[in-house]
From Swiss-Prot:
Function statement: Necessary for protein synthesis in mitochondria. Functions as a ribosome recycling factor in mitochondria.
Family matches, as SUPFAM superfamilies: Ribosome recycling factor, RRF
Family statement: Belongs to the RRF family.
Keyword DNA-binding: no
Protein name: Putative ribosomal recycling factor, mitochondrial
Pfam family, one: RRF
Lineage: Eukaryota, Fungi, Dikarya, Ascomycota, Taphrinomycotina
Record localization: Mitochondrion
Keyword Hydrolase part of the UniProt annotation: no
One term of GO molecular function: ribosomal large subunit binding
Length: 244
């Protein structure tokens, strides 16, 4: 005798078949889980905390060093750019003077460390060295400086300084000085980048970092370097506008 199978029973059997095929015990599905685990492992490696912490320290140090270069350059720009009255006063104070005084702790010191500098009106600056032996060196340093000043010895212990009227030639000369400062700073930044490149290469050689890690590190380093160069160029452009 044949058993009559209803459509409902056939549908239920079909559902059970498909359910068994898609069950976690199926080799295909287990393979999918293994693939997912492997993928998750790769993702975890991409965010390896050991690499991230190590490189972040290097990058922060790199950025901090570049920041110091920028700050020093900004200060040099500020001192070099000819400004009215107070600017001239600040420029003179920032001059380095070879000192022959036996009391001098170093062979070269700032003018403000070896003399009293005061401003008398907008067109006259008076310098009184603490020791008369430094007068000759101060006069020579002012004469050799890039600043448009005329210095005269009033007496044995006093120097008078008057700003010269700036000319196109003197402004162009000062612009070259500013560009020289920027070039020096750019070279310092490049040297810092080279040092960081060596550190990255060292980690790659020792296999402390993977090739992907090193690629990411170099990319971030290059981005930080480009930003630093752009900031430098912007500072130079701003300083040149005040000169020419």
């Amino acid at each position: 005798m044949f058993r009559i199978i209803s459509k409902a029973t056939l549908f239920q059997d079909s559902q059970r078949f498909h359910t068994s095929i898609l069950s976690p015990r199926c080799a295909f599905h287990n393979g999918g889980i293994l693939h997912k685990k492997a993928k998750d492992k790769d993702v975890k490696h991409d965010h390896d905390p050991e690499f991230a912490n190590s490189f972040n320290k290097m990058l922060k140090s790199f950025e901090a060093k570049m920041q110091l270069v920028h700050e020093k350059l900004a200060k040099r720009f500020q001192e070099a750019v000819v400004l009215p009255s107070q600017g001239n006063f600040t420029q003179l104070e920032a001059l380095f003077i070879p000192s022959k005084s036996i009391k001098a702790p170093t062979p070269s010191r700032l003018l403000r460390e070896i003399a009293a500098v005061s401003q008398k009106g907008s067109q006259q600056i008076i310098i009184r060295p603490f020791e008369d032996v430094d007068i000759k060196n101060i006069l020579k340093a002012i004469e050799d400086s890039r600043y448009p000043f005329v210095a005269n010895k009033l007496n044995a212990s006093t120097i008078e300084v008057k700003p010269q009227r700036t000319t196109l030639e003197s402004r162009q000369q000062l612009a070259k000085v500013l560009e020289g400062y920027a070039k020096d700073s750019r070279e310092q930044l490049s040297a810092m980048r080279t040092e960081l490149k060596k550190e990255i290469a060292k980690n790659k050689k020792s296999k402390a970092w993977t090739s992907d890690d090193c690629y990411k590190a170099e990319a971030e380093m290059q981005t930080a370097f480009k930003n630093a160069i752009n900031l430098l160029d912007s500072g130079l452009k701003s300083a040149l506008k005040k000169v020419i």
